[in-house]
From Swiss-Prot:
One of its GO terms (biological process) is glycolytic process. GO terms for cellular component: cytosol. This is Phosphoglycerate kinase. It comes from the Bacteria. Belongs to the phosphoglycerate kinase family. The keyword Cell membrane does not apply. GO terms for molecular function: ADP binding; ATP binding; phosphoglycerate kinase activity. Substrate binds at D21, L22, N23, R36, H59, L60, G61, R62, R113, R146. Its main location: cytoplasm. The gene is pgk. ATP binds at K197, E324, G350, G351, D352, T353. It is found in: Cytoplasm. It comes from Acinetobacter baumannii (strain ATCC 17978 / DSM 105126 / CIP 53.77 / LMG 1025 / NCDC KC755 / 5377). It catalyses: (2R)-3-phosphoglycerate + ATP = (2R)-3-phospho-glyceroyl phosphate + ADP.
Length: 395
């Protein structure tokens, strides 16, 4: 993919406006996870080291436009950045008509979603953002699938528009996995429903050599192959769709599974009741009417791990079992370790996948971990990300 990169630009004395994803969780006035802030720091520091006058902006939460509320302010983020950067980071609430910032300084602009027209990508608002800067840097991959004034609109009107290091790294990794994958390529796609991952499955079936499915998605594929899935989560209306996908790409199915008696499960306290449920390993052909499949069995986990060992590219989206409960997490654990130990280039994305990576402590052994949730899935689906498309246009 051809786009301008912030790292290639001369920023000395330039006014640089950086769109980051600083949408951090806040509880009782405390930031509960600073992961997104830590991810943004290298970009901000790099712009400062290049001698830029830096302005950073982001959204936080889902405020009603034009109705700013203190709990949705970026004030806590400004305090965090002040400490992390070792210099004062002032928060500007009134900035659309201009901001005073000098080379070597960084300021934070208040929550973009306080501005009427932000979400609808109002061109007048986008032009006001663009007028603040000499260079606009899009670095928020997590919002790249949204055409908003601070993501797509400003990039259209700014004198220069470039990708920041975070966004560039995401696009390079996704391009390597999806556009120029080294073969054989294996994708792991798991989740509760085929319907929510249908575009992902269809897209990957045309690219990868083998498609490992897990969770409720795997149950639908098992039903399509004629197996009884008992009380397991599956989508009867998508059995034919599963057959069509399996006709296009090799989909290795589980040969054994881990089940629980559905009558022991309280669906109003699903994870709580599962913790007390007995896990039973069964051959897939032995699943009974009252069984609920909650993980792949050890034989299947070993077979899937062997597939991953011989692959050159791995794309991973979703755990293959209810890994939050240990007796139904062995399959996801085995696959996590197999991805980590493989020599393949691996890319992982999606909230549950990241939680599994954290649980099994393999983050350092994954080639690239995508920060982008919905944007990651839309890229994998083959959809155009508006904030990326404008950077490609302007390159």
């Amino acid at each position: 993919m051809n786009f301008q990169r912030m790292t290639d630009l001369n920023l000395a004395g330039k006014r640089v406006l950086i769109r980051e994803d600083l949408n951090v969780p806040v509880k009782n006035g405390v930031i509960t996870s600073d992961a997104r802030l830590r991810a943004a720091l290298p970009t901000i520091k790099a712009a400062l080291e290049k001698g830029a006058a830096v302005m950073v902006f982001s959204h936080l939460g889902r405020p009603v436009e034009g109705e700013p509320k203190p709990e949705q302010s970026l004030a806590l983020v400004a305090a965090y950045l002040t400490e992390a950067l070792g210099q004062e980071v002032k928060l500007f609430t009134d900035y659309l008509d201009g901001v005073e910032v000098e080379a070597g300084q960084v300021v934070l602009l208040e929550n973009v979603r306080f501005n009427p027209g932000e979400k609808k990508n109002n061109p007048e608002l986008a032009q006001k953002y663009a007028a603040l800067c000499d260079v606009f840097v899009m670095d928020a991959f997590g919002t790249a699938h949204r055409a908003e004034a601070s993501t797509e609109g400003v990039a259209r009107f700014a004198p220069v528009a470039a990708a920041g290091p975070l966004l560039a790294a995401e696009l390079d990794a996704l391009g390597r996995a999806m556009q120029t994958p080294e073969k054989p390529m294996v994708a792991i796609v798991a989740g509760s429903k085929v319907s929510t991952k249908l575009d992902v499955l269809n897209s990957l079936s045309g690219i990868c050599d083998q498609l490992i499915v897990g969770g409720g998605i795997a149950n639908t594929f098992l039903a399509a192959a004629g197996y009884n899935v008992g009380k397991s989560l599956y989508e009867a209306d998508l059995v034919e769709t599963a057959k069509q996908i399996a006709a296009k790409v090799s989909v290795p199915l589980p040969t054994d599974v881990v089940v629980a008696d559905a009558s022991q499960i309280n669906f109003e306290d699903f994870l709580g009741s599962l913790a007390a449920a007995q896990a039973v390993i069964k051959k897939v052909e032995d699943v009974t009417a009252n069984d609920m499949i909650l993980d792949v069995g050890p034989e299947t986990a070993k077979a899937f791990a062997n597939i991953l060992t011989t692959s050159k590219t791995i794309l991973w989206n979703g755990p293959v079992g209810v890994f939050e409960v240990d007796q139904f997490g062995e399959g996801t654990k085995a696959l996590s370790l197999a991805v980590a130990q493989s020599d393949a280039f691996s890319i992982a994305g999606g909230g549950d996948t990241l939680a599994a990576i954290d649980k099994y402590n393999v983050a350092d052994q994954i080639g690239y971990i995508s920060t982008g949730g919905g944007a990651f899935l839309e890229f994998v689906e083959g959809k155009t990300l508006p904030a990326v498309a404008v950077l490609l246009e302007r390159a």
